[in-house]
């Protein structure tokens, strides 16, 4: 196993950008085809998975797929690494079965909202997902239910916002983040994020 430190940019999480970085190139994504399974690292077929996928493999091999598949929901079996940050007492990564509720994730695992404040919103799939509000606190967390609620689970990088925080300021900070992190390749992202910040 080789651990390769990325350049740290947001775009570096995209799989073709990761392959470019491993080859010493600028970590910009490319449009397939060819797909990585056909032509990836050093023009060879490449299987690229995240650490969460690899972490699940030993248990499945040792115990079989049935115990893992018995966890979770009907639509999404198994577990997920829920990464929670923002206005919580115990930010961190919690491996839990799909279907755990947002309320349970925040209150029982992340220790509740900082300073006893009320929950206002959460971005369940990181900065690029739509936020969920207090009406979603009992939502089962899996790809299906979060999509039905109008957002996306994605990498399950939960950004929790407490009551008293201005959501316009949050939107401006996210716009600045995306302006800074744009690879500059396409016009909507390169120029659009600049224009959004100017507004």
Describe the predicted segments one by one.
Residues 102-105, 118, 182, 196:
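Extended, hydrophobic alpha-helical segments in both membrane/secreted and soluble proteins
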